[in-house]
Amino acid sequence: MVTGILGIKKSQSQTFTEDGKRIPVTVVSAGPCWVTNIAHYGNFAGVQLGFGNRKHITKAQEGQMKKAGLDKKPRFLREIRIPTHPQAHTGGESELGTPPVSASPAGCKVGDTITVGDVFAPGDPVRVTGTSKGKGFAGVVKRHHFAGGPRTHGQSDRERAPGSIGQTTTPGRVYRGKKMAGRMGTDTVTVRGLKIVAVDPQNNILTIKGLVPGGRNGLIIIQKEL
C-alpha cells in the first residue's frame, strides 16, 4: 500500500483537544495523486506520484501519461519508496532490476488514484519533506550562528565577520564545505515526529500537528513513519 502522498502547504492554525489543550497545526491540501510509474529497487518499490494540474507538459511526460492510461497533465512528479520485504530498511545498498516480491508489491498499480483517505487516519505518525523558505544572501552570523568578533580592543568592523578561513596547510587553501556567507534557505528539509490530527477526504484536506517546512503553497511530501 502507498505510504505517502503529495500536497500543498496552505496555512498554519491551532486546534484544541478534548481537555482544552491548544496544539499548533498545519493545514495541507493533499491529493488526489495518480500513480504514474512503479520501479523496483531490491527490497523497495519506487512509486511515482503525479499531483496538480498544468497547461503544458513535455513530450516525454505526455508519453509517460499515455502509457499509464492517464488523461492528466500533472504539475509535480515525485517518487515515494515503499518497503516490499518485511526486513527492508532505509539504509544499505539496493539492486536495480530485482524481480518484485509479488505481482503488486506496492499495493497499487499504474493508473490508480490515491486520496488522503486511502493513506492516512487520525493519529498516524508522519514525516514531512519540503523546501525551506529562502532567506537570500546571509552572513555567517545569521546563516551558521557564528559568534562574530569582539566589539572593542581596537576592532572597528569585525563584529559580524567570519574571521580566518585558512587551515594552516601547505599549500594554503580553503577546505571544501567551509562555512561561509552565501545564499540561505531553499534546502530540502524533513521534519519527523509529526502526527495526523484530522483527515477530510471530501475536500482533500490533512490537518497535521506541528509545523512543516516551506512557505505557503509550497510542495510537500507526507509519508507515514514505518
Predicted regions and their residues:
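Extended basic (Lys/Arg/His-rich) segments that typically form rRNA-contacting surfaces
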Residues: 1-226
